[in-house]
């Protein structure tokens, strides 16, 4: 188990571990997204929706809503940028934890959100923007990490691209290769393994959303600590490796 956790978020990557890690992170994104909606009626991983809502707000002169959406997008971009900085710094230092550090930071931020969420609600003017910015930053942080780790093959915080790719592969699978002039090597074939993988991601995002919604309704912000613990366990082994190595 310890070896598996080390390889899951460690420096030396294989497609197998990228795919396994993406399963955990897709569930996490679905849960955090649903919890954010329960907390303040906004989805924080869905930049397409936020951008559309901002454009609509600007069109009807709702300047506050427009600025709120713009700041949310900036927070997501900032999270992605900070993740890239951490990863590139870790790569320059040749750290085992170059990909684990952004996850560990995400874990700590979710823990802060879980512990302080109820207390923050008393500050109405501060609560909603702070919560939205924190969750958007977290989603950007995670999405950039798995994007860089997998060479842009996988993203976990939204499913539009996943559903599109499923449709493409289904279309390729249904394509009739009837032209005898084409050799079999030029036949169009769907990637069934990719379809299964992407369908798993979509299902896990849905299940994460279900778990996040139920968890928030049942216990409030403290439910976020489950996600924080999950990410901490995923990230801690490569970090400990670097700590041990630095103390030798």
Give a label for each model feature.
Residues 2-248:
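Alpha-helical transmembrane segments of multi-pass membrane proteins
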């Amino acid at each position: 188990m310890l070896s598996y956790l080390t390889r899951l978020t460690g420096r030396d990557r294989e497609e197998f571990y990228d795919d396994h890690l993406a399963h955990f992170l897709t569930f996490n994104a679905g849960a955090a997204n649903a919890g954010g909606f329960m907390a303040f009626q906004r989805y924080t991983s869905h930049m397409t929706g936020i951008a559309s809502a901002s454009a609509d707000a600007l069109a009807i002169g709702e300047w506050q809503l427009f600025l709120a959406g713009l700041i949310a997008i900036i927070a997501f971009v900032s999270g992605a940028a900070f993740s890239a900085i951490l990863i590139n710094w870790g790569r320059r230092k040749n750290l085992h934890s170059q990909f684990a550090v952004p996850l560990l930071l995400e874990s700590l931020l979710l823990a802060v959100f879980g512990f302080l969420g109820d207390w923050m609600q008393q500050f109405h003017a501060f609560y909603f923007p702070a919560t939205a910015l924190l969750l958007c930053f977290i989603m950007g942080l995670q999405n950039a990490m798995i994007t860089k780790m997998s060479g842009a093959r996988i993203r976990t915080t939204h499913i539009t691209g996943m559903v599109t790719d499923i449709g493409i592969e289904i279309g390729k699978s249904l394509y009739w290769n009837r032209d005898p002039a084409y050799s079999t090597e030029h036949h169009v074939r769907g990637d069934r393994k990719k379809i299964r993988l992407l369908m798993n991601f979509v299902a896990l995002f849905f299940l994460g959303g279900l778990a996040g919604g139920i968890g928030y309704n049942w216990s409030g912000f403290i439910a976020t600590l489950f996600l924080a613990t999950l990410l901490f366990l995923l990230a801690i082994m490569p970090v400990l490796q670097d700590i041990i190595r630095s103390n030798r």
